[in-house]
């Protein structure tokens, strides 16, 4: 027993070790927070979906893998080593993500995308267009300078290639040998004699850069087919760095405020909760940084929110300990029983949230995949490490006489049982009024799907001085032959000016068109426009994203109904599952109407918010159901269903409010910081999330329980009628 006093010191050493490891890392194998791999929305970069061009049939797996290898080699040649190249075998696409070369001011992301998709097949042809030698016959290519001090590309052929080249030059003596890159003629020298030795050179290079690009293409090899993209996103590193600084600030503020609240309210258990939270955050950082998982802005938001939700487990435990102390138990007994009786609620809540996050990972992509990953790892770490560590430390601390006193704990006071079920009609009416108001307001404003789901193009540029939107609109329309909307915006916090160009229709945009637009609006303007962000998406990509989003939400609902039916069979199973889902639908509609009221286009942020609210709200409802089940299974319990719900809701009310406060606090900090820093994407994510969290707390307290009572009482009345008929 005395040895347990040492556990707190062991735990503190372990926590300090992992916190230091998370901050500083250890060598090349364990990277810390400073070496985390950030997504293109943070550090700037390019994301493009390449699809085969001109193929009559779907490319095979082997062809796609071959194309990926070529793209990887081309990225190597450009020294872009930190990238992701993913094959979507089902869709027949290749998805490429790589960072913006922030150290190169002249880096052109559109040109980079265009070059990646070029087939780049080198061919040596005769005057009749007969192909004699191909790029695959070349073993090596390099840039050199000839005797006239001109840049050339030297070629070395394979053994088979050398023979083919010798045979071709022998046949074409006195004629020109035309050298093509794809269908572009790059050189047409006259063959004077048969060339042996397996070497040749390509002349006519205008510069070293042109020669190097040609050499890189030859060395990389040709794609098995040409690829094109009208689906891509780019973001400048300047915009990304501002977003990273803002989210880091939000994380610091949210964690500090959460810890201050926990210590002020729960005292000693609150201190233990903060230490546990530091341990969990350190583990989560390592889970992201060690495997170099790409973290995006929504991923950081998920990290902050998972930290806020992790506090929930400690709140449940602390509230249980307070109840045990109120019963007259000793501190040690209260702590022991508190953890024991809180475990089922913690387990059920974490399982449902983990499954929802897993669904988002499976069906989501890009930034939302990152959000799902951080949320899922946060939940798993909370369940496996967080709860255990807090119990380990608290059980050790109370072995010291100084802390084995009730003054270090918050003791619950007797509370009057609140009659939630008697006022259920008012709760239901309030919800109906809110939902109807939201429906009407959203209908007036009009719900709008983002280009992410519908397809389309949005171009964002930064500039200084003044911008003639009318002139720019006409210039861009002449380039793309589509209706164009041009708007200007100014970030009140930074003073940065933005030009936003939206192209009508649901077509994407080629990199060549994007370059032409930028050149056109810069031509003749004293104010130079610089690309900040581009988004070009084809309708079929958007339709796929919308379909996956709908599937994710439906699967989440189905899982919740099945899980609650199994876990809470004592509460009618199906009744508890269906009423929980109705409460969730209430919250989702609130979120949807927030999108409509504030004219926020519905995109994957809506999906992430919805799934987060599902995980949070169902967790709240499960805590209530768990308490109802506990009372209903009591041997001496003779309370009515309404009394059971009123007692259980009153007992869990403080926990619900405190959990809502900590999570809403985190979301509110994210919202405020995003508004101050002008991060529209995060604002459009955090505002609906904030509303959904508040709605989730309300629905779990005022809707789920009373609705379950109404269902069960209605079922009993039907059963009595049937029994009465049989008696007659």
Name these PLM-found stretches.
Residues 1-728:
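A structural signal for conserved, well-ordered secondary-structure elements
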């Amino acid at each position: 027993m005395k040895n347990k006093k040492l556990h707190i010191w062991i735990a503190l050493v372990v926590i300090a070790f992992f916190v230091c490891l998370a901050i500083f890392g250890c060598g090349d194998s364990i990277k810390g927070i400073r070496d985390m791999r950030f997504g293109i929305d943070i550090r700037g970069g390019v994301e493009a979906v390449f699809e085969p061009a001109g193929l009559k049939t779907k490319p095979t797996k082997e062809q796609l893998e071959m194309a990926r290898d070529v793209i990887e080699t081309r990225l190597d040649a450009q020294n872009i080593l930190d990238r992701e190249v993913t094959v979507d075998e089902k869709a027949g696409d290749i998805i490429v993500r790589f960072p913006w070369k922030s150290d190169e001011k002249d880096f052109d992301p559109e040109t980079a995308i265009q070059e990646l998709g070029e087939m780049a097949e080198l061919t040596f042809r005769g005057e009749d267009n007969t192909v004699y030698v191909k790029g695959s016959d070349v073993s090596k290519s390099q840039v050199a300078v000839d005797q006239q001090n001109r840049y050339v590309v030297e070629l070395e052929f394979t053994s088979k290639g050398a023979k083919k080249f010798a045979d071709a030059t022998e046949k074409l003596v006195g004629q020109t040998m035309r050298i093509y890159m794809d269908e572009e003629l790059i050189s047409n020298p006259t063959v004077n004699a048969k060339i042996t030795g397996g070497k040749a050179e390509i002349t006519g290079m205008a510069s070293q850069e042109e020669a190097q690009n040609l050499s890189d293409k030859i060395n990389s090899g040709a794609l098995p087919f040409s690829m094109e993209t009208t689906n891509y996103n780019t973001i400048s590193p300047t915009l990304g760095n501002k977003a990273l600084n803002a989210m880091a600030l939000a994380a610091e503020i949210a964690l500090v405020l959460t810890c201050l609240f926990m210590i002020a309210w729960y005292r000693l258990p609150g201190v233990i909760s903060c230490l546990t939270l530091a341990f969990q955050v350190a583990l989560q950082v390592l889970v992201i940084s060690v495997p170099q998982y790409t973290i995006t802005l929504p991923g950081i938001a998920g990290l902050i929110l998972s930290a806020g939700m992790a506090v929930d487990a400690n709140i449940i435990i602390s509230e249980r300990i307070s109840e045990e102390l109120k019963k007259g138990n000793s501190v040690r007994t209260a702590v022991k029983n508190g953890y024991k009786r809180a475990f089922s609620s913690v387990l059920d809540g974490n399982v449902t949230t983990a499954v929802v996050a897993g669904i988002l990972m499976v069906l989501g992509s890009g930034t939302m995949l990152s959000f799902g990953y951080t949320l899922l790892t946060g939940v798993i770490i909370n369940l496996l490490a967080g709860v255990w560590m807090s119990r380990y430390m608290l059980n050790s601390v109370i072995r010291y006489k100084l802390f084995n006193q009730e003054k270090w704990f918050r003791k619950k006071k007797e509370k009057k049982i609140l009659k939630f079920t008697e006022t259920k009609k008012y709760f239901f009416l309030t919800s109906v009024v809110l939902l109807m108001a939201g429906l009407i307001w959203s209908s007036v404003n009009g719900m709008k799907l983002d280009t992410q789901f519908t397809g389309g193009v949005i171009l964002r540029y930064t500039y200084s001085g003044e911008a003639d939107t009318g002139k720019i609109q006409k210039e861009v329309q002449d380039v793309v032959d589509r209706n164009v909307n041009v708007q200007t915006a100014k970030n009140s916090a930074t003073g940065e000016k933005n030009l936003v160009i939206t192209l009508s229709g649901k077509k994407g945009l080629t990199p060549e068109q994007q370059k032409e637009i930028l050149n056109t609006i810069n031509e003749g303007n004293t104010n130079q426009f610089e690309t900040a962000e581009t988004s070009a998406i084809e309708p079929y990509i958007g339709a796929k994203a919308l379909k996956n989003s709908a599937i994710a939400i439906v699967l989440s609902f189905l899982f919740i109904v099945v899980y609650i039916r199994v876990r809470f069979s004592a509460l009618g199973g199906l009744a508890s599952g269906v009423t929980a889902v109705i409460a969730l639908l209430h919250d989702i509609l609130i979120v949807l109407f927030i999108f409509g009221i504030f004219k926020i286009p519905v995109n994957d942020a809506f999906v992430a918010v919805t799934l987060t609210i599902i995980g949070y709200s169902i967790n709240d409802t499960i805590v209530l159901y768990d308490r109802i089940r506990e009372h209903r299974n009591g041997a001496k319990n003779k309370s009515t269903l309404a009394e059971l719900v009123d007692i259980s809701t009153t007992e869990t009310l403080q926990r619900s409010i405190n959990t809502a406060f900590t999570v809403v606090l985190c979301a509110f900090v994210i919202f405020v910081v995003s508004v101050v820093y002008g991060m529209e994407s995060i604002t459009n994510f955090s505002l609906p999330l904030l509303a959904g969290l508040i709605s989730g707390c309300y629905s779990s307290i005022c809707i789920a329980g009373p609705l379950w009572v109404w269902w069960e009482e209605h079922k009993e009345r039907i059963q009595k009628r049937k029994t009465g008929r049989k008696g007659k």
